[in-house]
């Protein structure tokens, strides 16, 4: 039989299993087949899948929720087709199913996939980021696409390979399916067998849709559970895969494998706290091999707790497997409260889309179990019980009551206990959880739902919960009037408002009955309680708390996990008043159910609560329910007991039952008609029937519910007044229901195997799993799927399908009725669970893939329970135990791993463990805990005597050691297990064995204070003679034990050891060979005052030092134990005793920062002034270690503050070295010398910089520390320090600026600029650039104050290059330009500033002034057309600016302007830019625009107005920006505008307009359209020129103006030089014509305007297209200047101006210029610094490009023909002017460098330089040097004749 079952039925048995390579569930196309069932080539139909189920293909039984579900075997083994749709297998071991997508999209069957191909791919595919995965997953749900399941791994590799929780990288925390998440079959959290059908038809009840939330909701799968590679059976019934509301299965996200090596340091150490098993809370996570993030590692170990009937053994899933829990968590009640929106058939629900929460991973990794109570449905009504809630409330509020820690509701089966709990949950903050898992009530099939949980459950879900509009209605039968009921009804709401967590125990779902899951789930629910939001926040902030609550930690030490992870944090939060001062309640239902799974070792839920309740804070209460016949399990709880059993006596119970019957009768016409004899039901009849039913019920709501259900469905009709037809008990009700369902015995026999399997299973099973189990018992003639479905349908009223597609018994009482009957009751329909165990065992045995640890434990459990070989031993001669061992050995290869699984270690199942060992498990197998200790060591540590005996019986090695060298005896001695120590010694364990720390068992017992074990070990035989390696003599061990006991404060052990001193050669002053301590130094260092006193009394020497030479006094002082110090001083120690380094106890205490010890020592006369061998005092040591309180105390006590050591270091030096700024500040304030230099030349500041102590650097600088060369040298490559030092320089400059010392301020700024680091700091350069901007602005203000307007403008432009959006820089530059009379350019800058900071009033004020000045200029120009206007007074502004203080605020521009003797000082601070910058030009600007209209008119004075108008309009249209280059602007300061230039300016405007259409570029100097218009209007339309302007000057000006245009062009791209040259050549021809035609102007000389007009005509033609326009990039890289600005130019410009002096009006008020020889900020040219200090009265603004072109023209034509007085040398003039037409200009050039560079770079071009080649090369030769060369002009000569344009200025100051 065994052979047949194991071999034949498995078709290939082990062989095929091995061939599969251990990929459980791997879908290999070629399966070995047995002869009778030919292999069907990968048939993907549902039928074949069913067949494979029938054949026993690999499918895991429902197992621990810990484990992911096992995937279904894929190929069917026979050709038979099973009609049912198939559910796809959920992979047990691995989170990812190799072949198919885990989920079948809602309602769609997943497409068949080629398993082997997919399988190979699955493991190798890299996963995308969790966020992306989550998104894809969600899209998949929305679009109905399947999502690939997680990778799978071979099972046996599971020992170390554990799956982690993120399959596919999906975030485990997503709240995809609201908060109730249960793992998908694929998820490690799910315990269901994975059996998602490959082609599940949409109607298939089995099809699953996975939604990524199982583990999505909690990362626990990671923390707690690394799933062993074996998929533990996912079916933990409670965990049932979590289904979406639409019935879709949630995908568990487990992915990746990780070898989790737990760091369990349980080995004892000489520490105060013994390390508990909880230490190994967080295993080290190794990167998972799979794709996808690996949250927390878990190690594998089976962890299921045994129950009396070995259930726990079967649950031994590996701890890692605990991820199963994840699936369970988050679930609401264990009630299936079926709400209408839940489709039990698993179809697609309409609200799927609405439920997708925004993707945001949760940080909480804990997940509550998913509870479903099948009996609570939407048609359940909850009536009454107000009296009960009222009593509970009163008792819990009664503070005087000793039993007010909680309440126990006691009642018999079916009395409504679960419904009471569910009612409270439904009204609590977790009510939504309950509603989420509710499903619609299964049609009207007679459902024996538990009233206990159900009846009282209508509004159970709260009124909104169900379609059956059953609300909490009170019938007249209810007790009391409405008034009296009011407070009672309030009681339930009050209690519900206090509920923060809940738990349901269900016997048929093992995991709900285990303590670790209880702790983890309660913690997860507490996090989700809105009253305890602070607790959630705390867990997020402190991940170690979450790891303490991980399932792994809960398995290892549930008491410590609950205490440290829940109770202590809650208490501390309450003390901090972060939790409201209220009482809170935890609900626990059905404690008696948990007793069914009582482990061999460890607590049941009731014993755990009894143990932990004393640690509960008084404000945290429990309400628990228990059956009346199990009251003894809660007898020790300090709870008030409320009984539901005193039925006849308690009128409230009577009233509740009546109210329920009345409610049901009145709400159903069917019941009314069936209880009336004549079809009429009057009140009296109803009352009579009600009384009869209530009397029969004996208080059971379940009885009433089931009976009224029969009336409602017409199965019972009252025929006589005797009511004989009404069943009298629950047993009769169940018998009646079964008789109605199974009319014949054969009908019941067909259903019997299904019931047997359901009774035997540890978890709820899906239909596929049950189908597989049923067929596992057949070798031939398997049951068909359709036939099976019919049988399941017949049982659907007894086996309720839950939302996760698993089946649970309708009520615990029905389950019990099927197995057991009271005496005298009918035995019909009794079931035999043993047969169910056999079928489940066969199912596991026939599974093709390897069994994981969890499944192996379950297989052992079922084999033992089935006991199929009973009675065969006599026939076969082989004992049944050996046959069972043979069975399990043939069925799985993971026996050793299962034996060492985590749960089987901490809550071992002894019987299953014995079976595993008999089957061949290795008793010396290494575990994953206690440093990979062998099983014997772990069991010795845990004190499991029975298991240790079992292991020793089978030959476990006594000398087996963990990685730290401890053997079983050491662990037993350290843990204090006396019996195990005796057992191990008797079996031959070595007493003198040393671990890797050199400690023997004797020392371990002494460290932990186990004197009885120490005595026992001393009496054992120790090896005589010289100790062997790894051993030691007894005397050495005793000396070590004395030191160990003294250090830990175990006085009883010390006394007993000292009592044996003579007998065993123990010396009280001896040093041990292990730590080198004496007993007194060890005790003193640990602060054990009592032990010190004891040792001193026994003769310990006060001055005896340890092996390192440290006396007891120093040990105590170093650790701050002043009480021990006092004791030792009292016993004669010298307070100023010094050690080998000359240090005193005071120095040691100061060094460690123990203030109380320092105070005590000083009070005892310790010397403050004593120095050690290095010259350090106590104060020096305190400063060196940064103990501010000690420093302060010592200084106050008179310590010398400037005491130097042998290296010349003072305490301040040492404090600066350490880096505590407050200590440094304190010392400085107390008079420490801040500039003290030690022997190495270092000052405190240098030390702080060297150590990068920025806070100290800042403090010292504030206190006046000087910056020397050493400081700058130390700051090299330390950007954070360097920026502080530079800011210090800026602050010094700012102080001088405010004092009016402009020169000194500029020097500081300049010095700071020299100290800037070179490029290369990357991101660190940002703050430096900000600071550089600040410095440039400060320098700009300084130069403006000293009337160096050109430099002021230049520095502002530099600031703009670094920070193009700086409104302060625009403002500063506008101020400089305005001072140099460049009103239009100033206007443009101000408009940019207004754009950037529209609300700044100061900018607006200045803008208004400049606009007014422009209008005035326009009026002056018009007047000048008739004659030279009088020179206006110099309008220079005096400003008081506060320099920029830091790189963050370039100090508000505090620029005060004095206009006409009234000075204003206002700061421009950044203001919100809410208003857009003004885009409408001012009236003045509009007037200017009108002048741009006529483009080709004659330039005679009469037509100037029209030309200017046309120019203005053109400019306005093109949005050009006219801002002169820096050189041009500076030159303009000294130039006066001639009246005859406007026409030529107009023509040049046209050129500029065409060239300025490109989009604005972000360069600092550019301005956008609106400001551009106004600027152009100033430039072009204004500025009358005096009649006598010389053409030479005009040419100069044109060169400058061209450079201006070139630089200011908007496009930012430089056109090639040849086009410029050509344009210039074209202009030459026109120029000569213009000279000839020009009519003489007033005063004789030819007006420049006359010359300009023809050029304008010609240039206008060429300027129409961008290609011919002359436009240059303004970037600094294209900076060029005319190479022709030579010395000759410098001479002739002034020459001509001087000659014209008679016709020119000289502007007065020129400031005195003091040329410099030294460069200023790299600017060598004096012209740049001086030239702008006098402001010419009238200036005409013109288009730079055109004027530049005209310059060439005029030059070529020979301006000598002009009737101007001076005769210019053609060559000289050409060399000056011509190059100006070509080179591009940029704003970023330093003025000072221009002349110098030009001269060095062959700037001087021969006299008649008309060859364009030279000019072509210039831009490339001089990119920077030439851009800013102002026309060299004398401030005294012909100011009114000078054009405002300036050629590249390389000379200026020489003529000033």
Curated annotation (Swiss-Prot):
ANK repeat start and end residues: 893-925, 931-960, 964-993, 997-1026, 1037-1066, 1075-1104, 1108-1137, 1141-1170, 1174-1203, 1207-1236, 1240-1269
Main location as per UniProt: other
Any one of the GO BP annotations: myoblast fusion
Record's GO cellular component terms: axon terminus; dendrite; neuronal cell body; postsynaptic density
Keywords for this protein: Acetylation, ANK repeat, Phosphoprotein, Repeat, Synapse, TPR repeat
Residues with N-acetylmethionine modification: 1
Source species, domain of life: Eukaryota
Biased composition (Acidic residues): 1454-1463
Family affiliation: Belongs to the TANC family.
The protein's name in its UniProt record: Protein TANC1
Taxonomic source organism: Mus musculus
């Amino acid at each position: 039989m065994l052979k047949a079952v194991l071999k034949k039925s498995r078709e290939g048995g082990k062989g095929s299993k091995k061939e599969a390579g251990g990929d459980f569930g791997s879908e290999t196309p070629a399966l070995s087949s047995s002869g009778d069932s030919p292999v069907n080539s990968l048939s993907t139909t549902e039928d074949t899948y069913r067949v494979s189920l029938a054949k026993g293909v690999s499918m895991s039984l429902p197992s621990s929720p810990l484990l992911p579900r096992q995937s279904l075997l894929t190929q069917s083994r026979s050709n038979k087709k099973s009609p049912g749709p198939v559910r796809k297998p959920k992979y047990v071991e691995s989170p990812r199913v190799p072949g198919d997508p885990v989920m079948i999209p809602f309602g769609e069957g997943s497409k068949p996939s080629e398993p082997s191909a997919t399988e190979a791919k699955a493991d190798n595919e890299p996963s995308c980021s969790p966020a992306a995965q989550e998104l894809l997953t969600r899209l998949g749900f929305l679009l109905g696409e399947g999502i690939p399941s997680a990778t799978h791994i071979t099972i046996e590799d599971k020992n170390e390979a554990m799956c982690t929780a993120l399959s596919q990288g999906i975030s485990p925390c997503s709240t995809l399916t609201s908060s109730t998440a249960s793992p998908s079959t694929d998820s490690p959290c799910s315990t269901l067998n994975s059996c998602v059908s490959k082609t599940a038809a949409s109607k298939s009840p089995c099809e699953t849709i996975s939604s990524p939330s199982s583990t999505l909701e909690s990362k626990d799968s990671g923390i707690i559970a690394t799933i062993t590679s074996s998929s533990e059976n996912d079916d933990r019934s409670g965990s049932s895969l979590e289904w979406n509301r639409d019935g879709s299965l949630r995908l568990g996200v487990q992915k990746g494998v990780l070898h989790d090596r737990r760091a369990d340091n349980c080995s004892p150490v000489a520490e105060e706290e013994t390390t508990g098993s909880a230490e190994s809370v967080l295993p080290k996570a190794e990167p998972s091999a799979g794709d996808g993030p690996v949250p927390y590692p878990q190690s594998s170990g089976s962890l299921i707790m045994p129950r009396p009937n070995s259930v726990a053994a079967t649950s031994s899933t590996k701890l890692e497997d605990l991820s199963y829990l994840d699936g369970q968590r988050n679930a609401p009640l264990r009630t299936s409260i079926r709400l209408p929106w839940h489709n039990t058939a698993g179809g697609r629900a309409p609200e799927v889309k609405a439920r997708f929460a925004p993707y945001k991973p949760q940080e909480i990794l804990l997940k509550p179990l998913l509870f479903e109570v099948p009996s609570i449905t939407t048609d359940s009504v909850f009536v009454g019980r107000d009296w009960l809630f009222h009593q509970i409330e009163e008792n819990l509020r009664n503070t005087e009551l000793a039993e007010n820690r909680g309440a126990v509701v006691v009642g018999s089966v079916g009395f409504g206990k679960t419904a009471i709990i569910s009612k409270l949950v439904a009204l609590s903050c977790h009510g939504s959880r309950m509603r989420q898992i509710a499903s619609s009530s299964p049609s009207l099939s007679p459902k024996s739902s538990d009233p206990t949980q159900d009846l009282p459950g209508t509004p159970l879900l709260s009124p909104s919960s169900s379609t059956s509009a059953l609300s909490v209605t009170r019938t007249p039968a209810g007790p009391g009037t409405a008034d009296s009921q009011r407070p009672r009804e309030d009681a339930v709401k009050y209690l519900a408002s206090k509920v923060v967590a809940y738990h349901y125990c269900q016997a048929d779902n093992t995991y709900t009955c285990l303590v670790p899951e209880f702790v983890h789930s309660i913690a997860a629910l507490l996090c989700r309680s809105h009253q305890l939001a602070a607790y959630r926040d705390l867990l997020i902030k402190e991940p170690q708390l979450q790891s303490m609550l991980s399932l792994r930690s809960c398995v290892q030490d549930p008491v410590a996990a609950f205490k440290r992870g829940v109770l202590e944090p809650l208490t501390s939060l309450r003390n901090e008043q972060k939790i409201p001062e209220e009482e809170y309640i935890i609900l626990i239902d059905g404690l008696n159910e948990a007793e069914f799974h009582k482990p061999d070792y460890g607590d049941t839920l009731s014993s755990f609560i009894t143990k932990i309740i004393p640690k509960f804070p008084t404000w945290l209460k429990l309400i628990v329910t228990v059956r009346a016949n199990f009251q003894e399990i809660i007898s020790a709880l300090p709870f008030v007991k409320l009984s539901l059993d005193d039925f006849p006596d308690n009128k409230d119970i009577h009233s509740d039952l009546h109210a329920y019957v009345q409610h049901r009768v009145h709400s159903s016409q069917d019941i009314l008609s069936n209880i009336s004899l004549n079809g009429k039901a009057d009140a009296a009849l109803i009352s009579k029937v009600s009384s009869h039913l209530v009397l029969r019920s004996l208080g059971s709501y379940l009885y009433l519910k089931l009976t009224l259900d029969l009336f409602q469905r017409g199965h019972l009709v009252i025929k006589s007044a005797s009511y004989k037809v009404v069943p009298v008990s629950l047993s009769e009700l169940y018998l009646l229901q079964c008789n109605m369902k199974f009319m014949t015995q054969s009908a019941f026999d067909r259903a019997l195997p299904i019931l047997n399997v359901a009774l035997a299973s540890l978890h709820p099973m899906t239909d596929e799993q049950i189908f597989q189990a049923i067929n596992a018992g057949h070798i031939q003639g398997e049951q068909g799927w359709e036939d099976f479905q019919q049988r399941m349908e017949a049982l659907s009223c007894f086996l309720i399908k839950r939302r996760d597609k698993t089946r649970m018994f309708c009520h615990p009482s029905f389950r019990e009725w099927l197995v057991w009957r009271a005496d005298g009751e009918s035995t019909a329909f009794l079931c035999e669970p043993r047969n169910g165990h056999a079928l489940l065992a066969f199912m596991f045995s026939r599974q093709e893939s390897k069994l994981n640890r969890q499944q192996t434990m379950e297989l052992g459990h079922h084999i033992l329970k089935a006991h199929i070989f009973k009675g065969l031993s006599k026939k076969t001669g082989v004992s049944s135990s050996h046959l069972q061992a043979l069975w399990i050995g043939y069925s799985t290869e993971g026996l050793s791993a299962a034996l060492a699984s985590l749960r089987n270690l901490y809550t071992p199942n002894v019987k299953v463990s014995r079976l595993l060992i008999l089957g061949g498990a290795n008793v010396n197998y290494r575990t994953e805990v206690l440093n990979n200790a062998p099983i014997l060591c772990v069991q010795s540590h845990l004190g499991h005597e029975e298991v240790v005996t079992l292991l020793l019986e089978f030959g476990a090695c006594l000398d087996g050691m963990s990685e730290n060298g401890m053997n079983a005896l050491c662990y037993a001695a350290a843990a204090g297990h006396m019996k195990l120590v005796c057992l191990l010694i008797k079996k031959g364990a070595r007493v003198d064995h040393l671990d890797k720390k050199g400690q023997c068992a004797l020392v371990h017992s002494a460290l932990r204070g186990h004197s009885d074990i120490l005595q026992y070990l001393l009496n054992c035989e120790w090896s005589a003679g010289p100790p062997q390696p790894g051993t030691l003599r007894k005397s050495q061990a005793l000396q070590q034990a004395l030191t160990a006991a003294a250090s830990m404060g175990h006085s009883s052990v010390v006394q007993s050891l000292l009592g044996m001193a003579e007998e065993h050669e123990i010396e009280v002053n001896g040093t041990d060979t292990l730590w080198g301590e004496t007993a007194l130094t060890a005790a003193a260092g640990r602060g054990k005052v009592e032990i010190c006193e004891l040792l001193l009394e026994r003769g310990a020497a006060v001055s005896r030092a340890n092996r390192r030479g440290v006396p007891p006094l120093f040990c105590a002082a170093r650790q701050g134990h002043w009480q021990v110090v006092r004791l030792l001083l009292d016993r004669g120690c010298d307070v100023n005793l010094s050690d080998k380094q000359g240090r005193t106890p005071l120095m040691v205490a100061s060094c460690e920062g123990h203030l109380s010890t320092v105070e005590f020592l000083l009070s005892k006369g310790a010397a403050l002034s004593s120095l050690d061998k290095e010259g350090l005092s106590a104060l020096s040591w305190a400063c060196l270690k940064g103990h501010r309180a000690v420093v302060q105390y010592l200084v106050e006590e008179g310590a010398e503050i400037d005491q130097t050591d042998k290296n010349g270091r003072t305490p301040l030096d040492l404090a600066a070295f350490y880096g505590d700024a407050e200590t440094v500040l304190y010392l400085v304030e107390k008079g420490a010398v801040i500039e003290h230099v030690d022997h190495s030349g270092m000052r405190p500041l240098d030390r702080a910089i060297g150590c990068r102590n920025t806070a100290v650097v800042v403090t010292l600088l504030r206190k006046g520390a000087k910056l020397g060369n050493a400081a700058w040298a130390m700051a090299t490559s330390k950007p954070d320090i360097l920026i502080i030092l530079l800011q210090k320089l800026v602050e010094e400059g700012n102080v001088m600026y405010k004092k009016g010392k402009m020169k000194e301020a500029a020097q500081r700024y300049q010095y700071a600029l020299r100290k800037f680091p070179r490029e290369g700091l990357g991101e660190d350069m940002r703050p430096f650039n900000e600071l550089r901007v600040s410095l440039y602005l400060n320098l700009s203000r300084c130069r403006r104050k000293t009337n160096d307007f050109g430099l002021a403008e230049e520095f502002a432009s530099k600031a703009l290059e670094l920070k193009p959006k700086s409104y302060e820089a625009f403002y500063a530059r506008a101020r400089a330009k305005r001072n140099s009379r460049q009103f239009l350019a100033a206007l443009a800058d101000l408009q940019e500033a207004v754009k950037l900071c529209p609300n700044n009033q100061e900018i607006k004020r200045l803008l208004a002034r400049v606009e007014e000045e422009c209008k005035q200029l326009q009026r002056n120009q018009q007047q000048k057309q008739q004659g030279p206007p009088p020179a206006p007074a110099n309008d220079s502004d005096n400003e008081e600016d506060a320099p920029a203080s830091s790189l963050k605020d370039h100090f508000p521009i505090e620029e005060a302007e004095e206009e006409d003797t009234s000075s204003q000082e206002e700061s421009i601070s950044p203001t919100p830019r809410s208003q857009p910058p003004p885009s409408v030009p001012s009236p003045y600007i509009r007037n200017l625009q009108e002048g741009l209209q006529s483009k080709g008119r004659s330039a005679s004075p009469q037509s100037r107005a029209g030309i200017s108008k046309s120019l203005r309009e053109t400019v306005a249209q093109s949005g050009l920006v006219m801002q002169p280059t820096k050189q041009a602007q500076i030159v303009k300061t000294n130039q006066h505008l001639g009246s005859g230039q406007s026409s030529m300016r107009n023509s040049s405007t046209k050129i500029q307009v065409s060239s300025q259409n490109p989009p604005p570029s972000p360069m600092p100097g550019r301005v956008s359209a609106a400001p551009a218009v106004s600027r152009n209007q100033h430039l072009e339309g204004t500025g009358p020129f005096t009649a006598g302007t010389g053409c030479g000057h005009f040419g100069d000006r044109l060169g400058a103006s061209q450079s201006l245009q070139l630089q200011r062009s908007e496009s930012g791209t430089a056109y090639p030089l040849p086009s410029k040259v050509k344009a210039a050549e074209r202009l030459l021809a026109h120029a000569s014509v213009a000279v000839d035609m020009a009519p003489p102007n007033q005063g004789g000389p030819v007006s420049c305007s006359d010359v300009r007009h023809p050029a304008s005509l010609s240039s206008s033609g060429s300027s129409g297209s961008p290609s011919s326009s002359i436009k240059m990039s303004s970037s600094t890289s294209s900076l060029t200047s005319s190479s022709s600005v030579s010395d000759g130019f410098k001479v002739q410009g002034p020459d001509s101006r001087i000659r014209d002096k008679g016709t020119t009006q000289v502007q007065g008020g020129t400031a005195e210029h003091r040329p410099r020889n030294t460069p200023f900020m790299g600017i060598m040219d004096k012209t740049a610094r001086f030239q702008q200090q006098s402001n010419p009265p009238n200036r005409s603004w013109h288009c730079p490009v055109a004027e530049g072109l005209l310059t060439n023209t005029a030059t070529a034509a020979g301006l000598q023909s002009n009737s101007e007085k001076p005769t210019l040398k053609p060559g000289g003039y050409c060399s000056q002017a011509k190059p100006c037409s070509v080179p591009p200009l940029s704003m970023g050039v330093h003025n000072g460098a221009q002349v110098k560079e030009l001269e060095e770079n062959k700037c001087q071009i021969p006299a008649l330089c008309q060859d364009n080649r030279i000019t072509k090369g210039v831009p490339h030769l001089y990119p920077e040097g030439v851009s800013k060369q102002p026309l060299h002009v004398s401030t005294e000569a012909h100011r009114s004749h000078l054009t405002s344009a300036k050629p590249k200025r390389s000379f200026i100051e020489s003529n000033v």
